[in-house]
Curated annotation (Swiss-Prot):
The lineage of its organism: Eukaryota, Viridiplantae, Streptophyta, Embryophyta, Tracheophyta. GO terms for molecular function: heme binding; iron ion binding; monooxygenase activity; oxidoreductase activity, acting on paired donors, with incorporation or reduction of molecular oxygen. Its EC number is 1.14.-.-. It is a single-pass membrane protein. Pfam families: p450. It comes from the Eukaryota. It comes from Panax ginseng. It is an enzyme of class 1 (oxidoreductase). This is Cytochrome P450 CYP72A219. Keywords: Heme, Iron, Membrane, Metal-binding, Monooxygenase, Oxidoreductase, Transmembrane, Transmembrane helix.
Length: 518
Protein backbone atom coordinates (compact mmCIF):
# COMPACT_ATOMS: atom_id res chain seq x y z
CA UNK A 1 0.00 0.00 0.00
CA UNK A 2 2.80 2.35 0.92
CA UNK A 3 4.49 1.63 -2.42
CA UNK A 4 1.27 2.40 -4.30
CA UNK A 5 0.92 5.73 -2.48
CA UNK A 6 4.52 6.60 -3.33
CA UNK A 7 3.90 5.74 -7.00
CA UNK A 8 0.73 7.85 -7.08
CA UNK A 9 2.54 10.71 -5.35
CA UNK A 10 5.45 10.47 -7.80
CA UNK A 11 3.06 10.31 -10.75
CA UNK A 12 1.17 13.39 -9.54
CA UNK A 13 4.43 15.26 -9.06
CA UNK A 14 5.53 14.35 -12.59
CA UNK A 15 2.17 15.50 -14.01
CA UNK A 16 2.44 18.82 -12.14
CA UNK A 17 6.00 19.35 -13.41
CA UNK A 18 4.96 18.49 -16.98
CA UNK A 19 1.94 20.82 -16.85
CA UNK A 20 4.00 23.62 -15.32
CA UNK A 21 6.75 23.08 -17.87
CA UNK A 22 4.19 23.12 -20.68
CA UNK A 23 2.67 26.38 -19.43
CA UNK A 24 6.09 28.01 -19.22
CA UNK A 25 7.04 26.69 -22.66
CA UNK A 26 3.76 28.02 -24.08
CA UNK A 27 4.26 31.41 -22.36
CA UNK A 28 7.88 31.97 -23.45
CA UNK A 29 7.81 30.33 -26.88
CA UNK A 30 4.66 28.87 -28.46
CA UNK A 31 2.28 31.77 -27.74
CA UNK A 32 4.73 34.53 -28.80
CA UNK A 33 5.42 32.68 -32.06
CA UNK A 34 1.69 32.30 -32.69
CA UNK A 35 1.08 36.01 -32.02
CA UNK A 36 4.00 36.97 -34.27
CA UNK A 37 2.55 34.96 -37.15
CA UNK A 38 -0.87 36.53 -36.61
CA UNK A 39 0.54 40.10 -36.61
CA UNK A 40 2.64 39.52 -39.73
CA UNK A 41 -0.47 38.23 -41.53
CA UNK A 42 -2.17 41.53 -40.61
CA UNK A 43 0.62 43.56 -42.22
CA UNK A 44 2.69 44.34 -39.11
CA UNK A 45 6.45 43.83 -39.09
CA UNK A 46 9.18 43.78 -36.47
CA UNK A 47 12.11 41.79 -35.14
CA UNK A 48 11.67 38.04 -34.87
CA UNK A 49 10.86 36.96 -31.32
CA UNK A 50 13.89 36.17 -29.15
CA UNK A 51 13.38 33.74 -26.28
CA UNK A 52 12.07 35.23 -23.03
CA UNK A 53 13.56 38.75 -23.29
CA UNK A 54 12.35 39.70 -26.77
CA UNK A 55 13.73 43.20 -27.51
CA UNK A 56 14.21 44.20 -23.85
CA UNK A 57 17.98 43.59 -23.73
CA UNK A 58 18.52 45.64 -26.89
CA UNK A 59 16.25 48.38 -25.50
CA UNK A 60 18.28 48.63 -22.28
CA UNK A 61 21.60 48.76 -24.15
CA UNK A 62 20.33 51.43 -26.56
CA UNK A 63 18.88 53.57 -23.76
CA UNK A 64 22.10 53.34 -21.75
CA UNK A 65 24.13 54.44 -24.77
CA UNK A 66 21.68 57.24 -25.63
CA UNK A 67 21.77 58.64 -22.09
CA UNK A 68 25.55 58.51 -21.81
CA UNK A 69 26.03 62.00 -23.26
CA UNK A 70 23.98 65.15 -23.90
CA UNK A 71 22.87 66.25 -27.36
CA UNK A 72 23.00 69.59 -29.17
CA UNK A 73 20.20 72.07 -28.52
CA UNK A 74 18.53 71.61 -31.89
CA UNK A 75 19.11 67.86 -32.30
CA UNK A 76 16.17 65.50 -32.68
CA UNK A 77 15.35 64.22 -29.17
CA UNK A 78 13.60 61.01 -30.33
CA UNK A 79 16.81 58.91 -30.73
CA UNK A 80 17.78 59.84 -27.17
CA UNK A 81 14.54 59.04 -25.39
CA UNK A 82 13.03 56.12 -27.35
CA UNK A 83 15.88 54.80 -29.53
CA UNK A 84 14.45 51.30 -30.03
CA UNK A 85 11.01 52.53 -31.12
CA UNK A 86 12.65 54.86 -33.61
CA UNK A 87 14.84 52.05 -34.96
CA UNK A 88 11.88 49.67 -35.31
CA UNK A 89 9.75 52.27 -37.15
CA UNK A 90 12.69 53.29 -39.38
CA UNK A 91 13.31 49.64 -40.30
CA UNK A 92 9.73 48.36 -40.51
CA UNK A 93 7.43 51.38 -40.89
CA UNK A 94 4.58 52.69 -38.75
CA UNK A 95 2.73 49.34 -38.80
CA UNK A 96 5.32 47.64 -36.64
CA UNK A 97 5.81 45.89 -33.32
CA UNK A 98 8.51 45.26 -30.74
CA UNK A 99 8.82 42.62 -28.04
CA UNK A 100 8.36 43.46 -24.36
CA UNK A 101 9.59 40.09 -23.15
CA UNK A 102 7.24 37.44 -24.59
CA UNK A 103 4.53 40.03 -25.33
CA UNK A 104 4.34 41.93 -28.63
CA UNK A 105 3.81 45.69 -28.37
CA UNK A 106 2.15 47.07 -31.51
CA UNK A 107 2.63 50.69 -32.62
CA UNK A 108 -0.74 52.35 -33.27
CA UNK A 109 -0.12 55.56 -35.24
CA UNK A 110 -3.25 55.92 -37.37
CA UNK A 111 -5.29 58.81 -35.84
CA UNK A 112 -8.59 57.00 -36.51
CA UNK A 113 -7.32 53.89 -34.74
CA UNK A 114 -6.05 55.99 -31.82
CA UNK A 115 -9.48 57.59 -31.54
CA UNK A 116 -11.10 54.15 -31.38
CA UNK A 117 -8.69 52.87 -28.73
CA UNK A 118 -9.06 55.92 -26.47
CA UNK A 119 -12.85 56.07 -26.91
CA UNK A 120 -13.62 52.43 -26.07
CA UNK A 121 -12.08 52.18 -22.61
CA UNK A 122 -14.04 49.04 -21.70
CA UNK A 123 -12.44 47.11 -24.58
CA UNK A 124 -8.96 48.65 -24.47
CA UNK A 125 -7.65 48.57 -20.91
CA UNK A 126 -4.38 49.54 -19.27
CA UNK A 127 -1.91 46.64 -19.07
CA UNK A 128 -0.49 45.46 -15.77
CA UNK A 129 3.22 46.19 -15.77
CA UNK A 130 5.63 46.34 -12.85
CA UNK A 131 3.42 46.04 -9.71
CA UNK A 132 5.86 48.25 -7.78
CA UNK A 133 4.28 51.29 -9.44
CA UNK A 134 1.13 50.61 -7.41
CA UNK A 135 3.07 51.73 -4.34
CA UNK A 136 3.26 55.20 -5.87
CA UNK A 137 -0.36 55.71 -6.91
CA UNK A 138 -3.37 53.86 -8.27
CA UNK A 139 -6.73 55.59 -7.93
CA UNK A 140 -8.79 56.67 -10.92
CA UNK A 141 -5.78 56.44 -13.26
CA UNK A 142 -5.46 52.71 -12.54
CA UNK A 143 -9.16 51.79 -12.36
CA UNK A 144 -10.99 50.11 -15.24
CA UNK A 145 -14.59 49.71 -16.41
CA UNK A 146 -17.37 50.45 -13.92
CA UNK A 147 -14.89 51.06 -11.12
CA UNK A 148 -13.22 53.80 -13.20
CA UNK A 149 -16.63 55.36 -14.00
CA UNK A 150 -17.51 55.50 -10.29
CA UNK A 151 -14.17 57.07 -9.28
CA UNK A 152 -14.29 59.60 -12.12
CA UNK A 153 -17.84 60.68 -11.25
CA UNK A 154 -16.89 61.29 -7.61
CA UNK A 155 -13.66 63.17 -8.39
CA UNK A 156 -15.08 65.39 -11.18
CA UNK A 157 -16.56 68.04 -8.82
CA UNK A 158 -13.07 68.83 -7.46
CA UNK A 159 -11.99 70.12 -10.89
CA UNK A 160 -15.04 72.18 -11.87
CA UNK A 161 -14.33 75.76 -12.97
CA UNK A 162 -15.63 77.40 -9.78
CA UNK A 163 -13.53 75.08 -7.63
CA UNK A 164 -10.41 75.92 -9.66
CA UNK A 165 -11.04 79.63 -9.09
CA UNK A 166 -11.06 79.00 -5.35
CA UNK A 167 -7.65 77.31 -5.59
CA UNK A 168 -5.97 80.28 -7.30
CA UNK A 169 -4.82 81.94 -4.02
CA UNK A 170 -2.93 78.76 -3.06
CA UNK A 171 -1.28 78.64 -6.50
CA UNK A 172 -0.36 82.32 -6.19
CA UNK A 173 1.13 81.85 -2.71
CA UNK A 174 3.35 78.92 -3.78
CA UNK A 175 4.49 80.77 -6.93
CA UNK A 176 5.17 83.93 -4.92
CA UNK A 177 7.44 82.09 -2.49
CA UNK A 178 9.63 80.82 -5.35
CA UNK A 179 9.89 84.11 -7.28
CA UNK A 180 10.68 85.93 -4.02
CA UNK A 181 13.61 83.55 -3.43
CA UNK A 182 14.81 84.19 -6.98
CA UNK A 183 14.51 87.96 -6.50
CA UNK A 184 16.74 87.73 -3.42
CA UNK A 185 19.35 85.74 -5.39
CA UNK A 186 19.33 88.20 -8.29
CA UNK A 187 19.16 91.41 -6.22
CA UNK A 188 22.89 91.89 -5.49
CA UNK A 189 24.25 91.60 -9.05
CA UNK A 190 21.14 92.01 -11.17
CA UNK A 191 21.56 88.46 -12.46
CA UNK A 192 22.06 84.98 -11.05
CA UNK A 193 22.73 81.50 -12.42
CA UNK A 194 20.78 78.59 -10.97
CA UNK A 195 19.21 75.24 -11.77
CA UNK A 196 15.50 76.12 -11.88
CA UNK A 197 14.28 72.50 -11.87
CA UNK A 198 14.34 71.82 -8.09
CA UNK A 199 12.65 75.18 -7.43
CA UNK A 200 9.87 74.39 -9.91
CA UNK A 201 9.45 70.95 -8.35
CA UNK A 202 9.10 72.61 -4.94
CA UNK A 203 6.60 75.09 -6.36
CA UNK A 204 4.34 72.40 -7.84
CA UNK A 205 4.61 70.12 -4.80
CA UNK A 206 3.64 73.02 -2.53
CA UNK A 207 0.68 73.85 -4.77
CA UNK A 208 -0.58 70.26 -4.51
CA UNK A 209 -0.04 70.18 -0.75
CA UNK A 210 -2.01 73.43 -0.33
CA UNK A 211 -4.81 72.71 -2.81
CA UNK A 212 -5.24 69.08 -1.79
CA UNK A 213 -5.03 69.45 1.98
CA UNK A 214 -5.60 73.13 2.79
CA UNK A 215 -5.22 73.56 6.55
CA UNK A 216 -3.34 70.23 6.71
CA UNK A 217 -0.68 71.70 4.39
CA UNK A 218 2.35 70.87 6.58
CA UNK A 219 1.21 67.26 6.98
CA UNK A 220 0.71 67.15 3.21
CA UNK A 221 4.29 68.32 2.63
CA UNK A 222 5.65 65.49 4.79
CA UNK A 223 3.61 62.97 2.83
CA UNK A 224 4.88 64.48 -0.41
CA UNK A 225 8.50 64.07 0.72
CA UNK A 226 7.81 60.39 1.40
CA UNK A 227 6.17 60.02 -2.02
CA UNK A 228 9.20 61.60 -3.70
CA UNK A 229 11.49 59.10 -1.97
CA UNK A 230 9.14 56.31 -3.07
CA UNK A 231 9.28 57.53 -6.68
CA UNK A 232 13.10 57.54 -6.62
CA UNK A 233 13.18 53.96 -5.28
CA UNK A 234 10.71 52.79 -7.91
CA UNK A 235 12.77 54.50 -10.63
CA UNK A 236 15.86 52.61 -9.40
CA UNK A 237 13.92 49.33 -9.47
CA UNK A 238 12.53 50.02 -12.95
CA UNK A 239 16.03 50.30 -14.41
CA UNK A 240 16.50 46.55 -14.02
CA UNK A 241 14.58 43.74 -15.72
CA UNK A 242 11.60 42.94 -13.49
CA UNK A 243 10.89 39.30 -12.75
CA UNK A 244 7.66 38.14 -11.05
CA UNK A 245 8.03 37.99 -7.27
CA UNK A 246 11.07 40.29 -7.05
CA UNK A 247 9.16 42.77 -4.88
CA UNK A 248 8.84 40.11 -2.15
CA UNK A 249 12.59 39.65 -1.75
CA UNK A 250 13.86 41.05 1.60
CA UNK A 251 16.18 43.62 0.02
CA UNK A 252 16.94 46.98 1.63
CA UNK A 253 15.08 48.80 -1.15
CA UNK A 254 12.00 46.58 -0.94
CA UNK A 255 11.85 46.99 2.84
CA UNK A 256 12.08 50.77 2.58
CA UNK A 257 9.36 50.91 -0.10
CA UNK A 258 7.01 48.95 2.15
CA UNK A 259 7.84 51.21 5.11
CA UNK A 260 7.08 54.33 3.06
CA UNK A 261 3.80 52.88 1.79
CA UNK A 262 2.78 52.14 5.38
CA UNK A 263 3.80 55.61 6.66
CA UNK A 264 1.95 57.37 3.83
CA UNK A 265 -1.19 55.31 4.40
CA UNK A 266 -1.20 56.04 8.16
CA UNK A 267 -0.62 59.79 7.61
CA UNK A 268 -3.31 60.11 4.95
CA UNK A 269 -5.79 58.08 6.97
CA UNK A 270 -5.22 60.45 9.90
CA UNK A 271 -5.90 63.54 7.73
CA UNK A 272 -8.99 61.93 6.18
CA UNK A 273 -10.46 60.90 9.54
CA UNK A 274 -9.97 64.45 10.89
CA UNK A 275 -11.78 65.81 7.82
CA UNK A 276 -14.67 63.37 8.20
CA UNK A 277 -15.12 64.46 11.82
CA UNK A 278 -14.99 68.13 10.75
CA UNK A 279 -17.63 67.48 8.09
CA UNK A 280 -19.87 65.77 10.64
CA UNK A 281 -19.47 68.84 12.86
CA UNK A 282 -20.59 71.05 9.96
CA UNK A 283 -17.29 72.93 9.50
CA UNK A 284 -17.40 74.61 6.06
CA UNK A 285 -13.63 75.09 5.80
CA UNK A 286 -13.25 71.33 5.43
CA UNK A 287 -14.91 71.52 1.97
CA UNK A 288 -12.56 74.03 0.31
CA UNK A 289 -9.69 71.84 -0.92
CA UNK A 290 -9.43 68.78 -3.20
CA UNK A 291 -9.73 66.33 -0.32
CA UNK A 292 -12.70 68.18 1.19
CA UNK A 293 -14.50 68.37 -2.18
CA UNK A 294 -13.87 64.66 -2.81
CA UNK A 295 -15.16 63.66 0.63
CA UNK A 296 -18.25 65.87 0.21
CA UNK A 297 -18.96 64.40 -3.25
CA UNK A 298 -18.50 60.91 -1.82
CA UNK A 299 -20.85 61.59 1.09
CA UNK A 300 -23.59 62.95 -1.21
CA UNK A 301 -23.39 59.91 -3.49
CA UNK A 302 -23.70 57.48 -0.56
CA UNK A 303 -26.66 59.41 0.94
CA UNK A 304 -28.40 59.66 -2.43
CA UNK A 305 -28.33 55.89 -2.96
CA UNK A 306 -28.46 54.85 0.69
CA UNK A 307 -25.63 52.42 0.04
CA UNK A 308 -21.88 52.71 0.78
CA UNK A 309 -21.12 50.65 -2.35
CA UNK A 310 -21.82 53.78 -4.42
CA UNK A 311 -19.04 55.68 -2.67
CA UNK A 312 -15.32 55.26 -2.07
CA UNK A 313 -13.80 53.51 0.92
CA UNK A 314 -11.18 55.29 3.04
CA UNK A 315 -8.49 53.19 1.34
CA UNK A 316 -9.74 54.29 -2.09
CA UNK A 317 -9.70 57.94 -0.99
CA UNK A 318 -6.09 57.40 0.17
CA UNK A 319 -5.14 56.16 -3.32
CA UNK A 320 -6.76 59.21 -4.93
CA UNK A 321 -4.75 61.48 -2.60
CA UNK A 322 -1.54 59.70 -3.61
CA UNK A 323 -2.49 60.22 -7.24
CA UNK A 324 -3.06 63.96 -6.61
CA UNK A 325 0.54 64.13 -5.40
CA UNK A 326 2.17 62.23 -8.23
CA UNK A 327 0.18 63.41 -11.26
CA UNK A 328 -0.25 66.98 -10.02
CA UNK A 329 3.40 67.60 -9.28
CA UNK A 330 5.21 65.73 -12.06
CA UNK A 331 3.11 67.00 -14.96
CA UNK A 332 3.25 70.70 -14.10
CA UNK A 333 6.89 70.86 -12.97
CA UNK A 334 7.96 69.29 -16.27
CA UNK A 335 5.74 71.65 -18.26
CA UNK A 336 7.26 74.65 -16.45
CA UNK A 337 10.88 73.57 -16.76
CA UNK A 338 10.65 72.85 -20.50
CA UNK A 339 8.80 76.15 -21.00
CA UNK A 340 11.64 78.06 -19.35
CA UNK A 341 14.26 76.14 -21.35
CA UNK A 342 12.49 76.75 -24.67
CA UNK A 343 11.83 80.43 -23.95
CA UNK A 344 15.52 80.77 -23.06
CA UNK A 345 16.34 79.44 -26.54
CA UNK A 346 13.68 81.48 -28.30
CA UNK A 347 14.01 85.02 -26.99
CA UNK A 348 11.48 86.37 -29.50
CA UNK A 349 8.73 84.26 -27.94
CA UNK A 350 9.89 85.12 -24.43
CA UNK A 351 9.56 88.80 -25.38
CA UNK A 352 6.06 88.28 -26.83
CA UNK A 353 4.92 86.40 -23.72
CA UNK A 354 6.41 89.03 -21.40
CA UNK A 355 4.71 91.87 -23.29
CA UNK A 356 1.36 90.07 -23.09
CA UNK A 357 1.70 89.44 -19.34
CA UNK A 358 2.71 93.05 -18.59
CA UNK A 359 -0.05 94.39 -20.85
CA UNK A 360 -2.62 92.24 -19.02
CA UNK A 361 -1.47 92.58 -15.41
CA UNK A 362 1.31 95.18 -15.24
CA UNK A 363 3.05 94.40 -11.96
CA UNK A 364 -0.23 93.47 -10.27
CA UNK A 365 -1.30 90.08 -8.98
CA UNK A 366 -2.52 87.84 -11.86
CA UNK A 367 -6.23 87.03 -11.64
CA UNK A 368 -8.34 84.17 -13.01
CA UNK A 369 -9.95 86.05 -15.90
CA UNK A 370 -6.66 87.60 -16.99
CA UNK A 371 -4.87 84.23 -16.96
CA UNK A 372 -7.57 82.77 -19.21
CA UNK A 373 -7.01 85.59 -21.73
CA UNK A 374 -3.24 85.03 -22.10
CA UNK A 375 -3.37 83.84 -25.71
CA UNK A 376 0.39 83.91 -26.43
CA UNK A 377 1.28 82.18 -23.15
CA UNK A 378 -1.36 79.53 -23.86
CA UNK A 379 0.03 78.95 -27.38
CA UNK A 380 3.53 78.56 -25.90
CA UNK A 381 2.37 76.03 -23.29
CA UNK A 382 0.52 73.99 -25.93
CA UNK A 383 3.64 73.90 -28.12
CA UNK A 384 5.84 72.91 -25.16
CA UNK A 385 3.43 70.03 -24.45
CA UNK A 386 3.72 68.98 -28.10
CA UNK A 387 7.52 68.91 -28.11
CA UNK A 388 8.01 67.71 -24.52
CA UNK A 389 4.88 65.83 -23.42
CA UNK A 390 5.09 64.65 -19.78
CA UNK A 391 4.26 61.06 -20.79
CA UNK A 392 5.83 59.71 -23.99
CA UNK A 393 3.19 57.10 -24.77
CA UNK A 394 -0.02 55.42 -23.67
CA UNK A 395 -0.48 51.68 -23.74
CA UNK A 396 -3.52 49.45 -23.74
CA UNK A 397 -4.06 45.71 -23.78
CA UNK A 398 -6.86 43.56 -25.20
CA UNK A 399 -8.27 40.35 -23.76
CA UNK A 400 -10.15 39.12 -26.83
CA UNK A 401 -9.71 39.36 -30.58
CA UNK A 402 -10.70 42.87 -31.68
CA UNK A 403 -11.18 44.66 -34.98
CA UNK A 404 -9.47 48.06 -35.28
CA UNK A 405 -10.51 49.57 -38.59
CA UNK A 406 -9.57 46.97 -41.18
CA UNK A 407 -7.05 45.33 -38.85
CA UNK A 408 -7.69 42.35 -36.58
CA UNK A 409 -5.70 42.15 -33.36
CA UNK A 410 -5.37 39.03 -31.20
CA UNK A 411 -5.93 38.83 -27.45
CA UNK A 412 -2.78 39.36 -25.41
CA UNK A 413 -1.04 42.05 -27.48
CA UNK A 414 -0.17 45.45 -26.04
CA UNK A 415 -1.11 48.51 -28.10
CA UNK A 416 1.40 51.36 -27.89
CA UNK A 417 0.12 54.85 -28.70
CA UNK A 418 3.41 56.79 -29.05
CA UNK A 419 2.37 60.35 -28.14
CA UNK A 420 5.76 61.88 -28.87
CA UNK A 421 6.11 60.21 -32.29
CA UNK A 422 2.69 61.56 -33.30
CA UNK A 423 3.67 65.01 -32.00
CA UNK A 424 6.84 65.00 -34.14
CA UNK A 425 5.32 63.48 -37.29
CA UNK A 426 6.03 65.71 -40.31
CA UNK A 427 3.10 64.17 -42.21
CA UNK A 428 0.83 65.63 -39.52
CA UNK A 429 2.54 68.88 -38.50
CA UNK A 430 4.51 69.81 -41.62
CA UNK A 431 8.21 70.28 -42.31
CA UNK A 432 8.72 72.29 -39.11
CA UNK A 433 7.33 69.51 -36.87
CA UNK A 434 10.58 69.32 -34.87
CA UNK A 435 10.80 73.08 -34.42
CA UNK A 436 9.38 75.31 -31.68
CA UNK A 437 6.57 77.25 -33.33
CA UNK A 438 3.69 78.21 -30.99
CA UNK A 439 2.03 80.02 -33.90
CA UNK A 440 0.64 76.66 -35.03
CA UNK A 441 -1.79 76.87 -32.07
CA UNK A 442 -2.92 80.45 -32.76
CA UNK A 443 -6.43 79.21 -33.61
CA UNK A 444 -6.55 76.47 -30.99
CA UNK A 445 -5.86 72.75 -30.84
CA UNK A 446 -8.83 71.69 -32.98
CA UNK A 447 -7.68 73.84 -35.91
CA UNK A 448 -4.04 72.79 -35.51
CA UNK A 449 -4.91 69.09 -35.57
CA UNK A 450 -7.69 69.43 -38.19
CA UNK A 451 -9.96 67.59 -35.77
CA UNK A 452 -7.84 64.43 -35.70
CA UNK A 453 -6.45 62.69 -32.62
CA UNK A 454 -2.82 63.64 -33.24
CA UNK A 455 -2.19 65.78 -30.15
CA UNK A 456 -2.91 64.25 -26.75
CA UNK A 457 -0.37 65.24 -24.06
CA UNK A 458 -3.11 64.74 -21.43
CA UNK A 459 -4.55 61.66 -23.17
CA UNK A 460 -7.89 61.94 -25.01
CA UNK A 461 -11.50 60.80 -24.85
CA UNK A 462 -13.40 59.72 -21.72
CA UNK A 463 -10.14 59.06 -19.85
CA UNK A 464 -8.53 62.42 -20.61
CA UNK A 465 -6.55 63.69 -17.62
CA UNK A 466 -9.04 65.06 -15.11
CA UNK A 467 -6.50 67.61 -13.85
CA UNK A 468 -5.44 69.16 -17.19
CA UNK A 469 -7.22 72.49 -16.56
CA UNK A 470 -5.70 72.64 -13.09
CA UNK A 471 -2.21 72.01 -14.55
CA UNK A 472 -2.65 74.69 -17.23
CA UNK A 473 -3.96 77.23 -14.72
CA UNK A 474 -1.01 76.57 -12.41
CA UNK A 475 1.48 76.84 -15.29
CA UNK A 476 -0.03 80.15 -16.47
CA UNK A 477 0.09 81.64 -12.98
CA UNK A 478 3.71 80.57 -12.40
CA UNK A 479 4.91 81.73 -15.84
CA UNK A 480 3.04 85.06 -15.55
CA UNK A 481 4.73 85.80 -12.22
CA UNK A 482 8.16 84.75 -13.54
CA UNK A 483 7.78 86.87 -16.71
CA UNK A 484 6.67 89.90 -14.66
CA UNK A 485 9.97 89.87 -12.77
CA UNK A 486 12.69 88.22 -14.88
CA UNK A 487 14.17 87.65 -18.27
CA UNK A 488 16.24 84.49 -18.62
CA UNK A 489 18.74 82.82 -20.92
CA UNK A 490 20.42 79.42 -21.02
CA UNK A 491 23.58 79.17 -18.96
CA UNK A 492 26.77 78.00 -20.73
CA UNK A 493 26.70 75.11 -18.23
CA UNK A 494 23.29 73.90 -19.46
CA UNK A 495 23.50 70.40 -20.99
CA UNK A 496 20.59 69.43 -23.23
CA UNK A 497 19.65 65.90 -22.23
CA UNK A 498 15.94 65.07 -22.25
CA UNK A 499 15.32 61.65 -20.72
CA UNK A 500 12.25 59.73 -19.66
CA UNK A 501 11.97 58.22 -16.20
CA UNK A 502 8.24 58.06 -15.52
CA UNK A 503 7.99 61.56 -17.08
CA UNK A 504 10.15 63.48 -19.59
CA UNK A 505 12.76 65.46 -17.65
CA UNK A 506 16.08 67.29 -18.24
CA UNK A 507 18.67 64.74 -17.13
CA UNK A 508 21.21 67.30 -15.87
CA UNK A 509 18.76 69.92 -14.64
CA UNK A 510 17.94 73.30 -16.18
CA UNK A 511 20.75 75.79 -15.58
CA UNK A 512 19.59 79.28 -16.55
CA UNK A 513 20.74 82.84 -15.92
CA UNK A 514 18.01 85.07 -14.51
CA UNK A 515 18.06 88.85 -15.04
CA UNK A 516 15.94 91.14 -12.88
CA UNK A 517 13.36 93.39 -14.55
CA UNK A 518 12.54 95.32 -11.38
Amino acid sequence: MELVLKLISSFCAIVVVILLGWRIFNWVWLRPRKLEKYLRNQGFNGNSYRLFFGDVKEMIVMLKEAKSKPINLYDDIIPRIIPLNQKIITNYGKNSFLWLGPKPMVHIMNPDHIKDVLSKFYQFQKPRHNPLTKLLATGVADAEGDRWAKHRKLINPAFHLEKLKNMLPAIYLSSSEIVTKWEEMVSTKGQFELDVLPYLETLTSDVISRTAFGSSYEEGRKIFQLQREQAELIIQASQTIYLPGMRFLPTKRNKRMKEIAKEVKIALKSIINKRLKAMEAGERSSHDDLLGILLESNSKEIKQHGNTNFGLTVDEVIEECKLFFFAGQETTSNLLVWTMILLSQHQDWQKRAKEEVLRTFGNNKPDFDGLNHLKVVNMILLEVLRLYPPILSLDRTIYEEIKLGEISLPAGVILLLPIILLHYDQEIWGDDAKEFNPERFSEGVLKATKGRVTYFPFSWGPRICIGQNFAMLEAKMAMAMILQRFSFVLSPSYAHAPHAIITLQPQYGAHLILHSLI
